[in-house]
């Protein structure tokens, strides 16, 4: 097995929205804001090469939305999903599977593209995997709070392509088609899936939006986007405590400075020990 960190380009979101009720003087110590109060965010994905499988976890924002849409998020950097794959010697047709942690636009937008008048999958040979409960949450009757993040042009073409697999998601377990252990959490959104990967004697948890940046490690530091913030607090407390006890590394999706973080227990609770690149985490 090999793991690769896939950069898809940075974007910005309002710092207040990203930290909810946490006062700015506290959160800007780790996530400095620009003149519009926005903080820098990565849209990092994880690529898992395992035998004849090439599994992509999430797909970034993509590029098919309008200039007006992207103007709200101040995208930056030269990285893109396809360029990052190409730099590793892969092309879109090599991807065998795509696992979505959830279906907010910054996690799944890069899985489809415009092709003439149609929107089609970028990865022609891949199966796309999503929790059945989360898919229904996002497509059948999306709630007013999340509707703007569930862009149907990102979602329905996947179903129409015949490449979508909806897995049963009532509890934590294994996605049998991929052989990945999944933690299912419900604070940020319904049935967000956090894959756990054992690699070179260590365990990595893809933190997704449970812990979007290292600045969000303290349990009360929650995003204003979470639909069930008290549930998020319970989930973070339990999962981060377990991560410390089991020496689990967190793969950071939205932290522009750290790909991997190591946690430690302190008198104030679980905190950041150190951050590093994926490569550094596995250097002997």
Task: State the predicted function of each range.
Residues 72-83, 200-284:
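Cap/insert and terminal regions of metallo-dependent hydrolase folds
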Residues 55-57, 99, 128, 204-206, ...:
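Residue-level marker for buried hydrophobic side chains located in beta-strands
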Residues 76-90, 94-106, 122-184, 231-247:
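Metallo-beta-lactamase
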Residues 1-56, 61-65, 69-72, 170-171, ...:
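Zn-dependent metallo-beta-lactamase
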Residues 8-9, 59-62, 103, 133-134, ...:
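Active-site metal-binding loops of divalent metal-dependent hydrolases
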Residues 108-118, 262-263:
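Metal-dependent catalytic neighborhoods of phosphoester/phosphodiester hydrolases
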Residues 48-51, 195-200:
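Active-site beta-strand termini and strand-to-loop segments that position acidic
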